[in-house]
């Protein structure tokens, strides 16, 4: 399939700038691939589609406050630094994106905090906007990380055209987030409230947690018409034996195995055995899922509504079937569903 197959026009007013008042009260589109049907529900109705022994696969990555604002030495020009990943904890080396990139060069010092309590030096250019920074900080590693947390902002996506609020620190995070390392939330999971998870647990639904630290590469636009030539950025992935046991037992019993979000789906599709079971894994994945693709583990998924031409939309097309996905998106726009990170959800059966 070609890139142009994944383009559509989205009215601006359908882009969610704020989350639903309550997590589980966003809307839910339910797509049945067997029956070729589309239904409109509320997210809390998701409980009606799961029974004893079914499995929900959750990505327990935790978003850290990755966006820093500071000033450049001498000129005092305001700059933005987006922390991507830590390269070396002892040397305080980080892979970052900078803005405005043309003004931030090797050797420059950058100052953060009202009292310039954190300083970084640019030591390398990695891409047009990418830099390697060495943070100059005298305290312990723990104090340094606390300082980053204190000065950093919740990295809500740029298309949300408003200032970050204190509420974002809580709402741009799943309630089961544990392992810090993501610069973007696994957004399908944002819809689960404690109450809803408890009700699913009481019903006998099992939860398998995986960790995929979502990077900004997930949202990189695809710029090649031939999808097979697109390269995904690598993201850190951990799948434990415990998670594999829960998933494989459910699979053996022919239960519903539901990937909560594209990140959970990419995680499990990155570590499949020759017998089509889930294997433990610790490392990196740059798996790109686009049509046609045979899914080995999950037979069901929950996801948000994605941007045109995105790799996330391509995965949904591969799982849902392209024609049914197009029909669902057309209906979502007609019915006024909210799109993107803080938007509504779909359940694909």
UniProtKB/Swiss-Prot annotation:
NCBIfam families attached to this UniProt entry: PRK00147.1, queA
Pfam families: Queuosine_synth
Subunit structure: Monomer.
Coiled coil: none
Gene Ontology MF annotations: S-adenosylmethionine:tRNA ribosyltransferase-isomerase activity
4Fe-4S is among the record's keywords: no
Name the UniProt record assigns to this protein: S-adenosylmethionine:tRNA ribosyltransferase-isomerase
Record family assignment: Belongs to the QueA family.
Organism of origin: Flavobacterium johnsoniae (strain ATCC 17061 / DSM 2064 / JCM 8514 / BCRC 14874 / CCUG 350202 / NBRC 14942 / NCIMB 11054 / UW101) (Cytophaga johnsonae)
Catalytic activity annotation: 7-aminomethyl-7-carbaguanosine(34) in tRNA + S-adenosyl-L-methionine = epoxyqueuosine(34) in tRNA + adenine + L-methionine + 2 H(+)
Broad class of the protein's primary localization: cytoplasm
Compartment list: Cytoplasm
Stored SUPFAM superfamilies: QueA-like (SSF111337)
Pathway assigned to this chain's UniProt record: tRNA modification; tRNA-queuosine biosynthesis
InterPro entries in alphabetical order: QueA, QueA_dom1, QueA_dom2, QueA_sf
Record keywords, A-Z: Cytoplasm, Queuosine biosynthesis, S-adenosyl-L-methionine, Transferase
